């Protein structure tokens, strides 16, 4: 199956095209890139390089968050537009699931990717590696409350660790500080999307929305003013 993976949930964005589990084309952008301007041109560039036509794609997989409001909104809109235009199926992939792939070679039993959600909170989800399943829902939570939920020796990583390192240091956790582990990979988005699709999971184009977990700052200010 030929899959286009789109990942723009953070400051670093990337697009990948996979043929089965093989990455055949990829574009990555550094901090400060413009999601809106780069995403379409990068897809076109990849197709030119690998000499594929857009219609060769069998499935469009998009990372839906949590993460950057702007990045997620643009990625989802782009995925829906491509799905409509090409008549191809689209599948949503939660970003925290994608991040877990960054530590798939680690032997830790319990894993928790942590994304900085600002305003003294983080996005997180706890996974049981042995049972290959989530222990919790996708969370927006304070670091203090998250640490109370984590079993000792849990492997934690992601850009939500550094801002609250003193809090996470209060417990015997396995902390990986490599910044690269906090960057979701579009190739993993494509692979996970393919797995979900082959498992029979479907996503209607009209129902595809970002996984924000909380309202934007503007929405919260509006509610507070009422």
Per-segment meaning from a language model:
Residues 1-64, 183:
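N-terminal beta-alpha supersecondary unit
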Residues 134, 177-226:
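Acyltransferase
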Residues 12, 34, 65-69, 73, ...:
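Gly/Ser/Thr-rich beta-alpha loop segments that engage phosphate groups in nucleotides
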Residues 59-90, 95:
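DPxDG-like acidic metal-binding loop motif
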Residues 22, 34, 89-182, 212, ...:
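Surface "functional belts" at beta-alpha junctions
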Residues 48-55, 84-93, 109:
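Phosphate-handling active-site elements
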Residues 50-55, 105-107, 149-151, 197:
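Glycine-rich phosphate-binding loop signature in dinucleotide/nucleotide-binding domains
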């Amino acid at each position: 199956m030929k899959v286009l993976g789109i990942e723009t949930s953070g400051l670093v964005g990337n697009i990948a095209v996979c043929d089965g589990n093989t990455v055949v084309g990829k574009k990555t952008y550094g901090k400060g890139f413009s999601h809106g301007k780069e995403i379409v041109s990068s897809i076109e560039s990849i197709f030119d390089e690998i000499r594929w036509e857009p219609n060769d794609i069998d499935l469009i997989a998009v990372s839906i968050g949590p993460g950057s409001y702007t990045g997620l909104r643009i990625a989802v809109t782009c995925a829906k537009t491509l799905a409509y235009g090409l008549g191809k199926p689209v599948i949503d992939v939660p970003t925290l699931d994608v991040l877990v792939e960054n530590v798939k070679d680690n032997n830790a039993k319990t894993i928790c990717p942590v994304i900085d959600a600002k305003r003294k909170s983080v996005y997180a989800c706890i996974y049981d590696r042995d049972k290959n399943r989530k222990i919790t829902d996708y969370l927006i939570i304070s670091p203090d409350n998250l640490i109370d939920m984590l079993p000792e020796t849990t492997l934690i990583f992601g850009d939500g660790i550094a801002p609250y390192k003193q809090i996470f240091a209060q417990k015997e956790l396995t902390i990986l500080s490599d910044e690269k582990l906090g960057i979701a990979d579009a190739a993993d988005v494509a692979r996970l999307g393919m797995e979900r699709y082959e498992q029979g999971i479907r996503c209607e184009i009209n129902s595809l929305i970002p996984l924000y977990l909380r309202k934007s700052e503007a929405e919260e200010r509006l509610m507070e003013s009422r």
